[in-house]
Curated annotation (Swiss-Prot):
Protein's UniProt name: Glutamyl-tRNA(Gln) amidotransferase subunit A
Quaternary data: Heterotrimer of A, B and C subunits.
Coiled coil: none
Disulfide bonds: none
Entry annotated with the keyword Ligase: yes
Length: 483
């Protein structure tokens, strides 16, 4: 039962082959047995899950029948969940229980999903390895000595290990797509504003976007359908009609124009990954796609620009955590200033402190024009590069990551090396574009992903390409040994 995809679960529930409660109990038992190896969950919500599963079964018995009704999933632990701890992977919020549900959580709950728990993540979503969590590193089920990617590493590891069929994640610079690539999943970052950020604890507000993580494009389409749509409570939400993502999955790729940027194949890319990217291109050509080379000339400036803009926004967003209203508070402060200093110094981990300091520096008087303003200008140039490319092609294809998963601890003391792992993913966030990673093979037994990018609000096109690719390849069906 645990091997089923979300779509298979939907069909099984509709055909009354099993109940949501039966499935939920099987998965909760599996999590209890296997997750100690992975550390993919921060909180389990067994009682809530059973209650929601029973309610879903009752709704189905009354004649209701939706694709997510009774489907089990987990939420990344930065989505507010009423009465349940929302820690953001940090000591700072270790005791925080939100008084409301995030829009993503409430929409999926209304569709009938069953919440099994909250997944582990890099502290405040800052990281590409899921090593900065206050609750310990998450392990990659494909090799327990390796990282699963980050910051949505808990969601990725749990789905890859078949602990559950799907999970929510967030993507600020690749935090859905990169862990999806490193754990053999399909992960989608929607267009900025497509999915509500209300109730999602912010890292960098102009870059953050929530999205689905699952084993197949078909499953991501089902989950995105339940997540997407305008939300008046989110000022950055865009009032754009939500199409039927599942309806376009089987569209032919004949005549689809795929662009491959020449700048993607630089010295930093593992040549074995480059080979797998070229093989995926050939598969899509067999399906009728037309492939041509495109150029993204400002790609080389993306990482410096991102690591000015994201920390700058983080330094502002995280200023609210001061030990006064909620969150961690130091013991016996001498005065208010001491309360602020010690609560933040003790409550935040080293990577979060590093990014706050970088961001505060970039925004400080005398440096704002030199750093932050210049970074925003580069952001505009990167967006323009994509607009020029999309004048000639429908989709852009390339690697998701320059390397497969690395050993836990290998890049802990070299943050720049970890930042470089975001090279291919951060441009979609800077430009606000939708991006998807899909399984494309293995290097040394570790999964590799290929990334697809499309114009604004063309998530359906990405899901269509990925689904058609998954009809002629079997990479996405491979499971890690022992799980």
């Amino acid at each position: 039962m645990h091997q089923m995809t979300l779509a298979e679960i939907a069909r099984g529930l509709a055909d009354k082959k099993f109940s949501s409660e039966e499935l939920t109990r099987v998965l909760l038992s599996r999590i209890a047995t296997l997750d100690p190896q992975l550390n993919s969950f921060i909180s389990l919500t067994e009682d809530l899950a059973i209650t929601q599963a029973q309610a879903a079964d009752a709704r189905r018995a009354a004649g209701e029948n939706g694709p997510l009704l009774g489907a089990p999933l987990a939420h990344k632990d930065l989505f507010c969940t009423q009465g349940i701890r929302t820690s953001c992977g940090s000591l700072m919020l270790d005791n925080f229980k939100a008084p409301y549900d995030a829009t993503v959580v409430s929409r999926l709950a209304s569709a009938g999903t069953v919440t099994l728990g909250k997944t582990n993540m890099d502290e405040f979503a800052m990281g590409s390895a899921n090593e900065s969590s206050h609750y310990g590193a998450v392990k990659n089920p494909w090799n327990l000595e390796c990282v699963p990617g980050g910051s949505s590493g808990g969601s990725a590891a749990a789905v890859a290990a078949r602990l559950l069929p799907a999970a929510t994640g967030t993507d600020t610079g690749g935090s859905i797509r990169q862990p999806a690539a490193l754990t053999n999943l399909t992960g989608l970052k929607p267009t900025y504003g497509r999915v509500s950020r209300w109730g999602m604890i912010a890292y960098a507000s102009s870059l953050d976007q929530a999205g689905p993580m699952a084993r197949t494009a078909e499953d991501c389409a089902l989950l995105l359908q339940g997540m997407a749509g305008f939300d008046p409570q989110d000022s950055t939400s865009i009032d754009e009609p939500v199409p039927d993502y599942s309806a376009s999955l089987n569209t032919s790729l004949k005549g689809l124009r795929i662009g491959v940027p020449k700048e993607y194949f630089s010295a930093g890319l593992d040549p074995r990954i480059a080979q797998l990217v070229h093989e995926s291109v050939r598969e899509l050509e067999k399906l009728g796609a037309i492939v041509k080379e495109v150029s993204l000339p400002n790609l080389q400036h993306a990482i410096p620009a991102y690591y000015v803009i994201a920390p700058a926004e983080a330094s502002s967003n995280l200023s609210r955590f001061d030990g006064v209203r909620f969150g961690y508070r130091c013991e016996d402060p001498k005065d208010l200033t001491d309360l602020y200093k010690r609560s933040r110094a003790e409550g935040f981990g080293p990577e979060v402190q590093r990014r706050i300091m970088v961001g505060a520096y970039a925004l400080s008087a005398g440096y704002y024009d030199a750093y932050y303003l210049q970074a925003q200008k580069i952001r505009r140039l990167i967006k323009n590069d994509f607009m020029n490319a999309f004048a000639d092609v429908d989709v852009i294809l390339g690697p998701t990551t320059p390397n497969p998963a690395w050993k836990i601890g290998a890049k802990t003391h070299d943050p720049i090396a970890e930042y470089l792992e975001d090279f291919y993913t951060i441009t979609a966030n800077l430009a606000g574009l939708p991006g998807l990673s899909m399984p494309a093979g293995f290097v040394d037994g570790l999964p590799v992903g290929v990334q697809l990018l499309a114009p604004y609000f063309q998530e359906g096109r990405l899901l269509n390409v990925a689904h058609q690719y998954q009809q002629v390849t079997d990479w996405h069906t491979r499971a890690p040994e022992g799980f």
